Amino acid sequence: MEAADINDDVVHPEVRAHITNLVSALGGYSADDDGSYKLGDEALDVLRDLKKWIRFYDEKTNRMDVARCLAEANLVGGDLLQILTLWPQSETDSKYKARIALACFEVMVPLTWPIEKERAEMTINHHRHMPVLQLAQLGYKRAIINFDAIPILNTAVRVALPSMAMPIGERTPRDQAIIKLILFFLRNVAMIAPPQGVKCEGDETQVSRSATIDAFSYQDIFLTLLTLASNMGEDFRTEDVVIMEIIFHLVKRVDPSSLFVSEKQLNKAKGQELASEMRKEAAMLKSYNKTTTTRHSRFGTMIWVKRADGKMVTVSGQEALLDAKTRERKMDNSKTFRPPRRARKPEMEPKDLGPPVTLDERARQQLRSFVQDFLDSGFNPLFLHVRQSIDREALHALNQHKSQFFYLVAWFLEAERMRRKAKRDESKSTSAAGEEVNSFNLVAAVLQQEMFASMNRALDRSYSDKDWQLLTSVMRCYTQIFLTVQEMSESPNEEDQEIAENTLSRLFYEETTHDLIANIARTYKDQGFEYLDAATELVHTFLRILEGYSKQNVDLQVRSRKRARRKKKAAKAAAAVAAARAAGEEAEDVGVPEDNDADDSGDDEQHAERVTQERKFEFGKFAIRFAPQGVVDTFVAFTKFYRDLNDAQLKRAHRYFYRVAFKLELSIMLFRLDIINLFYNMVQGPEPLDKSSPMFKEWEELSKQIIRKCVKKLQERPALFTELLFSKIGSTTHFLEHGYEKPVTTTTPRPGAELEFKRATERDEQIGIAVSVLIDKQQVEHLQWLKDQLTSAMSERQAWENVDKAMAATTEGAADGEAADERSNKSAPPHITIRPDTEARRTAMFKNPHLRLLMRLVGMERLTPTLDETPDSTWILPGSHTAEAIQDTIDLINKAEFSPPTFEDGGSAEDQLRRKSAAASRRTRAAYDDDEEEIRGFLGDDDDEDFLFAPGGPTARKPDARPQKKRQRKRRREAGSGDEEDEGVSDEVLAARAKKRREKELEKIRKIKSEMYVHASDDETDDERDREFFERERKRQETKDSKFDSMLGALGLSVLSQVNGGEKSAWEAVLDDEPESDESENEGRKNAKRRKKQVASGSEEEQEEEEEEEEEEDSDEELPTKQAKSKTSKRKAAVPSKRPARRPGTAKKRAVVELSDNDEDEDEEEDAMDVDSANERTTRNEAPLPSSPGEGLGRRIDKMAMDDGDEDEDDQPVVAARQRPKARGGFIIDSSDEE
């Protein structure tokens, strides 16, 4: 009764009663002597009713009551399998029995369906039924594969065989459902495994993997799977994932290398494995014996341990008596750390793989035969079709199938490599036919570019979605593909080598794959050992193969991707450029959107896209990506399992640490206490590596070298004592490695592009266009902010002007002198600072080109235009803008805002703008380095032409050319009489003549070439020429000094011999007394400058340049003077001449003083005007340069044009003009001389 009560509590009584009645009505054993099973009268209907109960009660209500009742009634083993025996293989025409058999499988498939429930979704009913149903399914599998009366699996295939034999075009949906039903039944039988942590009833070998493989082989299920797989895509389409699942549950956790070895080799390997395990056990027991209990352990032991600081510590236990190291470990173990309680970490290990599987010899041979046949005939069609189904996200392809697909691809690729290796061991020489059959073409379906794209997509998506199980499978697949391709490259077949070369180039081409693999290894954290093993194996294989491939292909190119900006109107801009080119316009005139506007309020809506770029691959730089502390921690976590790792896994970790410490020379990354302690324990710790292992020596040497480098580095960098406790970051690593901080470089952001208008328009139209662009781009907030700033500036400027007017009114009654001084001291209006209200506005002021254009149009400018602009640069409104002008600007903005301008061509306001060229931008920046006058002079405002060099230029002629210059000057002086003939000519005619002469001279100057300034011999020196130059200068200076002394003596003056003694000379006194003698001052300064340069340099070339400069300046200053009457002049002109009267208000013209009638005396007297010598230096400042270099050029052109035009006229006597009052050429003139 107690059992009945319990059952009644678990399952509803009415449900149990209905199920029990249906099972009883299904049939039973006969009372005859044979004891065979007899069907009930309505057995087919009963089976259909049972299927409905399972579907509409258990599945709809999410309960398991019906399955629990059927398990307790032993429906499968007691009824359904017995019913299938009534349909023997010889009876192929009985449709009724075939329908009965199909109905039996329709009930068995849901009963054997895998029970997969999420723990969060499970109910109390699920917790009650699941353990019982899992054991019941294990009983179903035992009964099915061990049923002796009839092969149940083969019978299932017989049920679906008529539907399979039909062509795919003639199959009905019912035929498709029957085929899938049978395949699901085979999948369920292969998938059922003993539940973990539950003790099973009966012999587990009857439901083991070996028993399952034997049943599939004996009942010809392998042949069925091979037939379906080889015809996948032709006769079968939606059955691909189900067949893949069946194969997955047959081969998972089976070592492929164990399939393709002989029995003798397998026994030897098992013996070695057993011996290794026994050595590990002995080492473990040896370490335990030091602390294990003895026969006297029942007697308590307590000792006192005196520490270094003098404190006493109590330690209990006999193991404390062994040695000091044991006592210290005992004290450390007594320290308890109570971490905060956290939620239980989810199980990261893959649930569908299970523990490793060991097959018996019979099952191993059967599975080996199936794998070989599958590789030869069914691998390419099946996995090609499955990949296509997964890529197109077919309805029958679930998420779990992705992981199974990549796992199986990796498993079969490894099996193919093991098969080729076994054949190479059997026979070193392979026949041509065998090589053709066993070619890598058998696995070509997973070595295509589409497969690589699917892997990259799955790798990236699983990493982003944190699907660790799928990511583990993809990493396994990647590793096996790399190993397979590497083996292909080592094949003697040239075709395989070429395919391997192309495959490796495609695998290594994408730099995103490189980065993703490095990130996977760097971000490991509690994903389980399977994930850890797959990640470390991928990194090891990837680095090793890539290193070898990069050495063979030094010109390896990879495609890197970077972030870039793309405008929404890029297509429109391209079309505009094309139309402009077709029309013959400049491409610069087309409104192309700017690409440097990174502000959110910029030109167009932008979105980031990936722009690819090929670059040369450098393995050294790439390997650094696998040296950060995260990747090191991943391999350290893997190495901590060193007692459970095989030789291949230990070698993998050893090679990585060796690469980091010695190849990359980043051993500083391994200098951490836990890492050093791990290396020490692996060699000399309480549980070290097996000394008979081939990897022990390598690990011992590696640990020794790393510890040695660590000790040496501690001596060089004492700071490492502290850093031993922490992980190393980039800056810390650089400092510990080199002894100084890593320099940091920063980049300065660039301001927005400068825009200009395509057509010259008025200021109001320009403001209208700029305002319209901001409105079109929905940036009205910038426009409103600018108006607010202008309004505030207008109010402030108006207040300042009112105060200024009030102050001016209070000073009206003051004296004129005081008022003038006050007006002169009155400061200009202060500038107004433009302040952004938000950081976004500040960024827009720096990056938004249209806002910057409008700010410049309204008169705003930067406070420091000579410095490079930054986002923090200050903008101001200069004081030159009045309140009225600011108000007019605001009115223009308001007008453009409410009445935007329209254009004839129907274009937008943005089309009226274009970007300034690079040259224009450079000119704009250069304008800040010169003041306005220098710019105007440089551009030559006086003339329309710019000349880079003066006409003529210095020559290397000797002084014998000077008489020619004398005659020219004489002719110019005598030509002054021609002015009398021009008195009757109008000013317009004179201006026209002068213009023609200027144009003629400009034409001559254009023909001058720059080579007259630069010669190959400019850098050469001539000692003889220098000697002659200094001798000539010495004689010239003596002549001038004598002339000067004689002139001063005639006037009764004396020259002071000591100029620097503190007294002024007579010449200096004359100059100081007459500030208006401009000509004498200019001549003195010119001569002083020329003598200073000649003495300092001593080169003839500089002297000639100074002489040329003097002659040009003389020609500028010698202008025709007007005739004036002089009654008291001490010297009279040779021939009097009448000059036109000087216009009132003009300055006095410089006159020419004749000291002699002959040309030689005239020249010498002119030279005598130069007072400055090598021993006499004046302290006056040099005369300032002309404000515009073009002014001097224009005067020279006018003068030369006038001289050129007067050459044909008759020579006239030189007329002596009225002498300049007070001083001229050193002569002191009394005031009475002017009368």
From Swiss-Prot:
**Compartments, record wording:** Nucleus
User: Its Gene Ontology molecular function terms?
Assistant: DNA binding
Q: Where is the composition biased (Acidic residues)?
A: 585-603, 929-947, 977-986, 1070-1081, 1099-1118, 1156-1170, 1203-1212
Q: Where is the composition biased (Basic and acidic residues)?
A: 999-1044, 1193-1202
Which example biological process does GO assign this protein? DNA repair
Q: Which UniProt keywords apply?
A: Cell cycle, DNA damage, DNA repair, DNA replication inhibitor, Meiosis, Nucleus
Keyword check for Nucleus: yes
Q: List the disulfide bonds.
A: none
For bias type Basic residues, the affected ranges are: 964-973, 1124-1150
* Pfam family name, one: TIMELESS
Q: What are its GO cellular component terms?
A: replication fork protection complex
Q: Where is this region: Disordered?
A: 327-357, 584-610, 812-841, 897-1235
Relate the protein's function as given in its record. Forms a fork protection complex (FPC) with csm-3 and which is required for chromosome segregation during meiosis and DNA damage repair. FPC coordinates leading and lagging strand synthesis and moves with the replication fork. FPC stabilizes replication forks in a configuration that is recognized by replication checkpoint sensors.
Q: Which family does it belong to?
A: Belongs to the timeless family.
Q: How does it assemble?
A: Component of the fork protection complex (FPC) consisting of tof-1 and csm-3.
Q: What is this protein called?
A: Topoisomerase 1-associated factor 1
Give the species this sequence originates from.
Neurospora crassa (strain ATCC 24698 / 74-OR23-1A / CBS 708.71 / DSM 1257 / FGSC 987)
Q: Which gene encodes it?
A: tof-1
